[in-house]
Protein backbone atom coordinates (compact mmCIF):
# COMPACT_ATOMS: atom_id res chain seq x y z
CA UNK A 1 0.00 0.00 0.00
CA UNK A 2 1.29 3.46 -0.87
CA UNK A 3 2.24 5.55 2.19
CA UNK A 4 0.18 8.51 1.06
CA UNK A 5 -3.07 6.59 0.91
CA UNK A 6 -5.88 7.32 3.34
CA UNK A 7 -6.08 3.90 5.12
CA UNK A 8 -2.33 3.94 5.77
CA UNK A 9 -2.57 7.44 7.27
CA UNK A 10 -5.46 6.48 9.57
CA UNK A 11 -3.76 3.31 10.75
CA UNK A 12 -0.42 5.04 11.44
CA UNK A 13 -1.64 8.40 12.71
CA UNK A 14 -0.65 8.71 16.42
CA UNK A 15 -4.17 9.88 17.28
CA UNK A 16 -5.68 6.67 15.88
CA UNK A 17 -2.96 4.26 16.95
CA UNK A 18 -4.55 3.37 20.31
CA UNK A 19 -3.55 -0.33 20.31
CA UNK A 20 0.18 0.31 20.53
CA UNK A 21 -0.37 3.12 23.03
CA UNK A 22 -2.45 0.90 25.31
CA UNK A 23 0.20 -1.84 25.17
CA UNK A 24 2.90 0.56 26.38
CA UNK A 25 0.90 1.83 29.34
CA UNK A 26 1.41 0.12 32.67
CA UNK A 27 -1.08 2.12 34.73
CA UNK A 28 -4.78 2.94 34.33
CA UNK A 29 -5.47 6.40 32.87
CA UNK A 30 -7.99 8.83 34.31
CA UNK A 31 -9.74 11.80 32.65
CA UNK A 32 -8.84 15.04 34.40
CA UNK A 33 -11.40 17.61 35.58
CA UNK A 34 -11.43 21.08 33.99
CA UNK A 35 -8.97 23.57 35.42
CA UNK A 36 -5.86 21.38 35.74
CA UNK A 37 -2.74 22.54 33.91
CA UNK A 38 0.86 21.52 33.28
CA UNK A 39 3.92 23.73 33.08
CA UNK A 40 7.20 22.28 31.79
CA UNK A 41 10.74 23.16 32.84
CA UNK A 42 12.65 24.15 30.82
CA UNK A 43 9.95 25.19 28.40
CA UNK A 44 9.29 26.97 25.18
CA UNK A 45 5.65 25.84 25.10
CA UNK A 46 4.11 27.68 28.05
CA UNK A 47 1.22 26.08 29.91
CA UNK A 48 -0.88 23.15 28.70
CA UNK A 49 -4.31 21.80 29.65
CA UNK A 50 -4.14 18.39 31.31
CA UNK A 51 -6.30 15.79 29.50
CA UNK A 52 -5.60 12.49 31.25
CA UNK A 53 -3.17 11.14 33.83
CA UNK A 54 -1.89 7.91 35.35
CA UNK A 55 0.78 7.04 37.88
CA UNK A 56 3.33 6.79 35.08
CA UNK A 57 2.46 9.67 32.74
CA UNK A 58 -0.01 12.17 31.31
CA UNK A 59 -1.42 13.72 28.17
CA UNK A 60 -1.93 17.44 27.62
CA UNK A 61 -3.01 19.88 24.92
CA UNK A 62 -1.25 23.19 24.32
CA UNK A 63 -1.12 25.95 21.71
CA UNK A 64 2.12 26.89 20.01
CA UNK A 65 3.34 29.05 17.16
CA UNK A 66 6.24 26.71 16.38
CA UNK A 67 7.58 23.19 16.70
CA UNK A 68 8.90 22.65 20.26
CA UNK A 69 12.69 23.00 20.41
CA UNK A 70 13.32 22.42 24.11
CA UNK A 71 12.75 18.98 25.61
CA UNK A 72 11.45 19.40 29.17
CA UNK A 73 12.98 17.39 32.00
CA UNK A 74 10.51 18.35 34.75
CA UNK A 75 6.90 19.45 35.00
CA UNK A 76 4.55 21.02 37.52
CA UNK A 77 0.83 20.25 37.81
CA UNK A 78 -1.50 22.88 39.23
CA UNK A 79 -5.24 23.40 39.53
CA UNK A 80 -6.90 26.82 39.23
CA UNK A 81 -8.74 28.01 42.35
CA UNK A 82 -7.03 25.30 44.40
CA UNK A 83 -3.92 25.25 46.58
CA UNK A 84 -2.88 21.96 44.93
CA UNK A 85 0.50 22.05 43.22
CA UNK A 86 2.73 19.10 42.33
CA UNK A 87 6.19 20.36 41.47
CA UNK A 88 9.33 18.98 39.89
CA UNK A 89 8.05 15.72 38.44
CA UNK A 90 10.81 14.23 36.28
CA UNK A 91 9.55 13.54 32.77
CA UNK A 92 10.31 12.80 29.15
CA UNK A 93 8.23 13.42 26.05
CA UNK A 94 6.89 10.26 24.41
CA UNK A 95 5.03 11.96 21.55
CA UNK A 96 4.08 15.45 20.43
CA UNK A 97 1.93 16.12 17.39
CA UNK A 98 -0.36 18.71 15.80
CA UNK A 99 -4.11 18.17 16.25
CA UNK A 100 -5.29 21.44 14.65
CA UNK A 101 -3.71 24.32 12.73
CA UNK A 102 -5.20 27.75 12.13
CA UNK A 103 -6.08 28.69 8.58
CA UNK A 104 -3.01 30.90 8.21
CA UNK A 105 -0.73 28.35 9.90
CA UNK A 106 0.39 30.83 12.56
CA UNK A 107 -0.82 28.71 15.51
CA UNK A 108 -1.30 25.04 16.10
CA UNK A 109 -2.96 23.04 18.83
CA UNK A 110 -0.66 20.20 19.85
CA UNK A 111 -1.03 17.10 21.98
CA UNK A 112 1.91 15.81 24.03
CA UNK A 113 2.27 12.47 25.79
CA UNK A 114 4.67 12.44 28.73
CA UNK A 115 6.17 9.63 30.79
CA UNK A 116 7.20 10.30 34.38
CA UNK A 117 10.66 9.43 35.60
CA UNK A 118 11.37 8.09 39.08
CA UNK A 119 9.14 9.88 41.58
CA UNK A 120 9.87 10.56 45.24
CA UNK A 121 7.50 9.07 47.83
CA UNK A 122 6.02 12.54 48.41
CA UNK A 123 5.44 13.04 44.67
CA UNK A 124 3.74 9.61 44.49
CA UNK A 125 1.46 10.56 47.40
CA UNK A 126 0.54 13.90 45.82
CA UNK A 127 -0.03 12.25 42.44
CA UNK A 128 -2.33 9.67 44.06
CA UNK A 129 -4.19 12.53 45.77
CA UNK A 130 -4.52 14.37 42.45
CA UNK A 131 -5.92 11.28 40.71
CA UNK A 132 -8.35 10.66 43.56
CA UNK A 133 -9.71 14.23 43.82
CA UNK A 134 -9.16 15.88 40.41
CA UNK A 135 -10.21 13.24 37.89
CA UNK A 136 -13.63 12.17 36.64
CA UNK A 137 -12.96 8.46 36.16
CA UNK A 138 -11.06 6.01 33.98
CA UNK A 139 -10.49 6.67 30.29
Predicted features by range, described:
Residues 1-66, 128-139:
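N-terminal helix initiation/capping motif
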Residues 54, 93-97, 118-120:
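A generic structural motif
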Residues 67-71, 122-125:
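Short, conserved charged micro-motifs
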